[in-house]
Amino acid sequence: MSYGSGRFIDVREGPNVRFGYDGARIMARAGPLRVDAFAVRPQLTKPNAFDDIADVHQGFWGSWATLDLSALTADLYYLGVERDEFRYQKVDGKEWRHTVGARARAKLAVADVELEGAYQFGNVGASPISAWTIAGESVFRRAKLPLEPTMTLGFGATSGDRGPSSGTLGTFNPLFPRGAYFGLVSANGPENEVSPHAALALALAEGLSFSVEAWSFWRQSTSDGIYSVPGRLLRRGTPADARYLGTQVEAFLSWQIDRHVSLSGTLAYFAAGAFFDTSAPGKDIAYGAAWASYKF
């Protein structure tokens, strides 16, 4: 399953094998309106063919409505997740988390503009949840210029926990998002973060494209740590630790040879920020990869 921009539900193409679910989904369509409802369990990926099994320790359900017009796409959704055990910096235990949100993407004269916001509630153990996320992106396309440049400017923020004195758990959880959330490195996930980014894409020749993208990361709350893309705690944080996490730059080259075959390569660098000097020693990350894809 994949919905919207993949901030909550995606197949995780890229750094991982495709992410699947076992369960049921109902889809209804009336003109430009589509409504899906589902109740599933995430799959546990096994090494052999046709041996994946459902994760009985997690349940996932919800409904996603999309209105698709010529110049506007709007989403409204509710998502629920139940996990037998999940760990955050402040608390761990059985999790019941509910997400309500909306997303809109409009094609304007100067750019394509997207806005999304969501609120989360529920509980982990005895701690009630109160978390949020906001994101926005503008895409400027100039097809009549040489190399057909496309520039993207974006911003995202997700809540972190406010510390032991707060009466709620404020750590946002992205549920089952795209794997390459911040490129193929994705050294940190979209929890407790503020992350502006910019990108430039160029069409070098027929089927040959190049892009470069940069992100900077800060902790939204200095009382919370940093997490992986699926929401696992990577490193604890305190107000004594710096807010700045680092900056990442990634370049991507792709050649679509024909409708079936493509070749791709990427180089990326994550420069660790002051947080990794104050919390514990951290190192920069250099990453490179090349691959070929065949699609039937």
Tell me what each language-model feature is.
Residues 1-8, 38-45, 80-84, 114-120, ...:
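Flexible, solvent-exposed coil segments and beta strand-coil junctions
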Residues 149-150, 155-248:
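C-terminal structural cap/anchor segments
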Residues 282-296:
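Outer-membrane beta-barrel "beta-signal"
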